[in-house]
UniProtKB/Swiss-Prot annotation:
This is D-alanine--D-alanyl carrier protein ligase. Pathway: Cell wall biogenesis; lipoteichoic acid biosynthesis. The keyword Metal-binding does not apply. Coiled coil: none annotated. Catalyzes the first step in the D-alanylation of lipoteichoic acid (LTA), the activation of D-alanine and its transfer onto the D-alanyl carrier protein (Dcp) DltC. In an ATP-dependent two-step reaction, forms a high energy D-alanyl-AMP intermediate, followed by transfer of the D-alanyl residue as a thiol ester to the phosphopantheinyl prosthetic group of the Dcp. D-alanylation of LTA plays an important role in modulating the properties of the cell wall in Gram-positive bacteria, influencing the net charge of the cell wall. Its main location: cytoplasm. The gene is dltA. One of its GO terms (molecular function) is ATP binding. The lineage of its organism: Bacteria, Bacillati, Bacillota, Bacilli, Lactobacillales. Its EC number is 6.2.1.54.
Length: 512
């Protein structure tokens, strides 16, 4: 068990100073370098005399300087707000207006001119590193202090800043490095794929730094080159893969993504969106000896609140895979619309309690009051997810409350429709979306479909293909759930975080 994240990093700087903490295509930085650089940057930040404990926005990609700056800010007592280089200027501006950071550190060129907030460039960070200033930690982030603030997309389009404290982070990290499901080895070799602005990134950097391992990052230029990306990943000595299931589906389009080409890769950690039976089955085919860990949890509960190892038996027997056993320190409950706790097997809203629950949204008391509350004397959060608990305390996922629609008199869960379509042997990926009329009532249900290789060639017309797909799933799907129209695509759009961008597809069919 670790008691302080920075203490852990400092310990490895002493015991394994020359061991790589960060590797980007063979160019690496060591734990000793990380300590020296973060000390120097922390001293530089202190010299700016910022308001104590004020948040600092850090703009950039998955570079070493981003990591060193995060560690430095923690040492100097400031929460960091990671903003990815691919963020739209409008979103960056919205984050700044909400967070009111005391400083902006631009590891990459900053796309906006902001009045009233000082901006530190990469050249200034480099100069600070060269100064090699010693640093004594007297006011570092601890306890209930904010460690990082990650902005998620709000339902109104206005981003919300989730405040994660040092205590929140320790709750998650200690669970992950000690829980048998994750089976994290000492000195883990982890692929650093999700951007730092996505809290799934915490699932790779937190256990890696806590256990003295190495992060294998990819330059942003490579990430944009799909073919070269997965050819390169296959050459990396990573043992643990952390991503959304959608990113793994993309990886499996490359023949190099298999156990024969990547023998060191033994663990897959998934979070951020639902892991489907189809994706898990394909992974077992590609990596017969690998462990697949399905984790679940919102950003507001610090990355994940439950996890479970997915077995072949689960793949064969479940239509929707279980999302795990709740963390021991984070009791998870199912409640009805009146807030009453439901019994095992009953479906309702998933709520999480305990020390990993965020204190709320930064500078947004109204939204905080809506989502955060107290349950059985513990801080609690409304996930907005539908689920149930088995008698063995395994959490089952039933979709999003806000993805439920009323159609033809029936209440339909969109994710359930997508799941059923994904069961077709002809379908690689499917997403169900509603089309609304002028009264904003559901007019009909459509589905975006990506078929497996070679499927289209077997049919002369799309109509015949559609009939075949419908026939392949009709025995498991209620007729009122069947989409009236299939829209075929070569790929589905992804968000910057690697999730299928359902909102974009809904807007597309409704001409928004």
């Amino acid at each position: 068990m670790i008691k302080d994240m920075i203490d852990s990093i400092e310990q490895f700087a002493q015991t394994q100073a020359d061991f790589p903490v960060y590797d980007c295509l063979g160019e690496h930085r060591t734990y000793g370098q990380l300590k020296r650089d973060s000390d120097s940057i922390a001293a530089f930040i202190d010299s700016l005399a910022l308001l104590a404990k004020s948040p600092v926005l850090v703009f950039g990609a998955q570079t070493y300087d981003m990591l060193a700056t995060f560690v430095a800010l923690t040492k100097s007592g400031h929460a960091y707000i990671p903003v990815d280089v691919h963020s739209a200027p409008e979103r960056i501006l919205a984050i700044i207006e909400i967070a009111k950071p005391s400083l902006i550190i631009a590891i990459e060129e900053f796309p906006l001119t902001i009045e009233g907030i000082s901006l530190v460039s990469l050249s200034e960070i480099e100069s600070a590193k060269l100064a090699e200033m010693p640093y004594e930690r007297t006011h570092s982030v601890k306890g209930d202090d904010n460690y990082y603030i990650i902005f998620t997309s709000g339902t109104t389009g206005q981003p919300k800043g989730v405040q994660i404290s040092h205590d929140n982070l320790l709750s998650f990290t200690n669970w992950m490095i000690e829980d048998a499901a994750f089976d994290v080895p000492k000195q883990p070799q982890m692929l650093a794929q999700p951007p730092y602005s996505f809290d799934l990134s915490v699932m790779y950097w937190a256990p890696t730094l806590a256990l003295g391992g190495t992060l294998f990052a990819l330059p942003k230029e490579l990430v944009a080159d799909f073919k070269q990306l997965f050819t390169t990943i296959a050459q990396l000595p990573v043992g643990i893969w952390t991503s959304t299931p959608s990113f793994a589906d993309m990886a499996m389009l490359s023949d190099d993504f298999c156990q024969a080409k990547m023998p060191a890769l033994t663990h897959f950690y998934f979070d951020g969106e639902e892991l489907t039976v189809s994706t898990a089955r394909k992974l077992f085919e590609r990596f017969p000896s690998a462990k697949i860990i399905n984790a679940y949890g919102p950003t507001e509960a610090t990355v994940a609140l439950s996890a479970i190892e997915i077995t072949r038996e689960m793949v064969d027997n479940y239509t929707r895979l279980p999302i795990g056993y709740p963390k021991p320190d984070s009791p998870t409950y199912i409640i009805d619309e009146d807030g009453k706790e439901l019994a095992s097997g009953e479906q309702g809203e998933i709520i999480v309690t305990g020390p990993a629950v965020s204190k709320g949204y930064l500078n947004n008391p109204e939204k905080t009051a809506e989502a955060f509350f107290t349950f059985k004397g513990q801080p609690a959060y409304h996930t907005g997810d539908i689920g149930s608990l088995t008698e063995d305390n395994i959490l089952l996922y039933g979709g999003r409350l806000d993805f439920q629609i009323k159609y033809a008199g029936y209440r339909i869960e969109l994710e359930d429709v997508s799941q059923q379509l994904n069961q077709s042997p002809m379908v690689a990926s499917a997403v169900a979306v509603p089309r609304y009329n002028k009264e904003h009532k559901v007019q009909n249900l459509l589905a975006y479909i990506v078929v497996k290789d070679g499927v289209k060639e077997r049919f002369d017309r799309e109509l015949e293909l559609t009939k075949a797909i419908k026939a392949s799933v009709k025995d498991h799907m209620m007729s009122y759930m069947m989409p009236s129209k299939f829209l075929y695509r070569d790929s589905l759009p992804l968000t910057p975080n690697g999730k299928i961008d359902i909102k974009t597809l809904i807007n597309e069919v409704n001409n928004r």
